């Protein structure tokens, strides 16, 4: 690494960005069961199991309310076809609440397969690192003391922007994982709503929202792949321009590309919901 402070400051900011981007790539290929050593998952599974008892109680409640609202009289309940329909609904809902964890993990694995297919098709095993062009390093190192004073301000502002954007992006990806845990933990309660016809929309909305959270990973991967292609073709540097202008134009274009990626990651949930009509 160069001994120049300006170059070091910019390179450190880019290293932070690259490390966070690599961390995102690693997180998106992980399962909730193995995330952070699996300790969080064990607690979530215990909470899920504890809430199953409440889910069974709500299942009976939703079932009774559904029967009362959908049947005009007790005579309708005694009809074989109607009684069979009610029994099948109750049995299916009981199975969904009992095996809700397996159902949700199966859905997650299916969508994770979509993410893996996108990675393999694009030929990306990891993200492309963003590096400082040699032209800028040489130009900055050739600067005198007074010429480098404006560069300090430019690199401080640019480095701060890049660092803040990297943390905003990684927080969004961690937020997705936390939502996966939240959905998994409370799953027995909304899934029990399938027992009654009037309340079944609660369960449908829950499963749609969970699928949308899972699909966010595929959108983030696509955004990272597009950014990596941008990073492989760095901004054009004009060697005849002043050093401050050269560095400022490079940082400005780089931050713009980063803003596009951060915006895509931050709005991945909204994009998925618009695609799925949620």
Annotate each language-model stretch with its function.
Residues 1-10, 80-100, 203-213:
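Alpha-helical transmembrane segments and their helix-start/interface "positive-inside/aromatic belt" motifs
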Residues 1-58:
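Binding/recognition "hotspot" determinant
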Residues 23-26, 82-89, 109, 116, ...:
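Short amphipathic alpha-helical coupling elements at transmembrane boundaries
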Residues 44-52, 84-88, 92, 141, ...:
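Alpha-helical membrane-interface segments at transmembrane helix boundaries
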Residues 53-65, 157-163, 180:
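Hydrophobic alpha-helical transmembrane segments
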Residues 58-94, 186-200:
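Hydrophobic transmembrane alpha-helix segments characteristic of membrane transport
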Residues 94-186, 220, 224-277:
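Non-cytosolic segments of integral membrane proteins
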Residues 191-208, 240, 271-275:
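Alpha-helical transmembrane segments
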């Amino acid at each position: 690494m160069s001994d120049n402070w300006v170059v070091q400051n910019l390179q450190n900011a880019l290293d932070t960005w690259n490390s966070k981007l690599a961390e995102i790539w690693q997180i998106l290929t992980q399962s909730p069961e193995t995330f952070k050593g699996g300790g969080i998952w064990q607690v979530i599974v215990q909470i899920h199991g504890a809430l199953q008892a409440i889910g069974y109680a709500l299942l009976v409640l939703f079932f009774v309310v559904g029967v009362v609202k959908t049947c005009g009289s007790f005579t309708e309940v005694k009809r074989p076809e109607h009684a069979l329909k009610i029994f099948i609904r109750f049995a299916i809902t009981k199975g969904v609440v009992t095996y809700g964890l397996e159902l949700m993990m199966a859905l997650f694995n299916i969508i994770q397969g979509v993410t893996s297919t996108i990675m393999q098709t694009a030929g990306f095993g990891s993200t492309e690192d963003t590096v400082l062009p040699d032209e800028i390093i040489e130009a900055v190192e050739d600067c005198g003391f007074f010429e480098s004073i404006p560069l300090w301000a430019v690199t401080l502002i640019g480095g701060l922007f890049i660092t803040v954007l990297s943390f905003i992006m990684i927080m969004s990806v961690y937020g997705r994982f936390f939502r996966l845990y939240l959905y998994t933990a409370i799953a027995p309660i909304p899934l029990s709503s399938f027992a009654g016809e009037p309340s079944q929309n609660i369960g449908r909305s829950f499963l749609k929202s969970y699928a949308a959270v899972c699909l966010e990973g595929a959108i983030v991967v696509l955004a990272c792949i597009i950014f990596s292609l941008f990073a492989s073709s760095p901004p054009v540097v004009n060697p005849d321009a002043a050093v401050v202008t050269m560095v400022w134009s490079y940082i400005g274009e780089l931050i713009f590309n980063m803003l596009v990626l951060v915006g895509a990651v931050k709005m991945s949930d909204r994009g998925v919901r618009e695609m799925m009509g949620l």
